[in-house]
Amino acid sequence: MADPSLNNPVVIQATRLDASILPRNVFSKSYLLYVIAQGTDVGAIAGKANEAGQGAYDAQVKNDEQDVELADHEARIKQLRIDVDDHESRITANTKAITALNVRVTTAEGEIASLQTNVSALDGRVTTAENNISALQADYVSKTATTSQSLASPLNVTTSYSVGGKKVLGARQTGWTAATGTANKGVFDADLTFAVSDTYTQSEIQAIANALITERRRTKALEDALRAHGLID
């Protein structure tokens, strides 16, 4: 803090010193001149002292002002250090967060690549399925369609065929011995009648025998048909 006493001027009690105030015929002229010169010197010294005191006071006032300014600067620097420390902490936290995000992004990129591979595989499977569906739509047998349907390939069933819920064709029957002789696939009159007299003539018996042969051949033809269709063996 500035010393206010430095601002107080030096007061010279004797403000005027010349030959008129000195006793006459006591001192020599040279001494009188010396005394007068001393008074002048004392005044000059007092002036310089006052200037020096004022300068010292002004310097102390300036120092006090600078001390206040330096204290403000120190406080601001301290706050800046606190802010910098806070920023460093936040930067460190952000760096860690960025590192974690990088890891997550890398993981996500790997998962995306895997998903892209899976999607490509699924695209291939979907394309194949679409082609299969198109093929099925162009060539399939419907359970609900009422129009005539056909198959180009053999059809295999485990038990039997039914029409209206009634069995019409079952599994092959085995144990049949194949008939021999000639099969009759020609004209066959199921209503043919025979004349029979009381004495059974030769011609009547021959007609019945011929009809029996025709029937047997017809039976052979039917058996051949059943075998051809795989119904008996």
From Swiss-Prot:
Protein's name according to its UniProt entry: Tail needle protein gp26
Motif position, Basic cluster: 216-220
One GO term of the biological process aspect: symbiont genome ejection through host cell envelope, short tail mechanism
Keywords, comma-separated and alphabetical: Coiled coil, Late protein, Pore-mediated penetration of viral genome into host cell, Repeat, Viral genome ejection through host cell envelope, Viral penetration into host cytoplasm, Viral short tail ejection system, Viral tail protein, Virion, Virus entry into host cell
Quaternary structure and partners: Homotrimer. The trimer forms an elongated coiled-coil (240A x 25A). The N-terminal tip may exist in a pre-ejection extended conformation, which may fold into a trimer of hairpins only after ejection into the host. Interacts (via N-terminus) with the tail hub gp10. Interacts with the head-to-tail adapter protein gp4.
Main location: virion
Mapped Trimerization heptad repeat repeat ranges: 61-67, 70-76, 77-83, 84-90, 91-97, 98-104, 105-111, 112-118, 119-125, 126-132, 133-139
Cellular localization per UniProt: Virion
Coiled-coil stretches noted in the UniProt entry, renumbered to this chain: 61-139
Species of origin: Salmonella phage P22 (Bacteriophage P22)
GO cellular component, one term: virus tail
Keyword rRNA-binding part of the UniProt annotation: no
Region (Interaction with tail hub protein gp10): 2-60
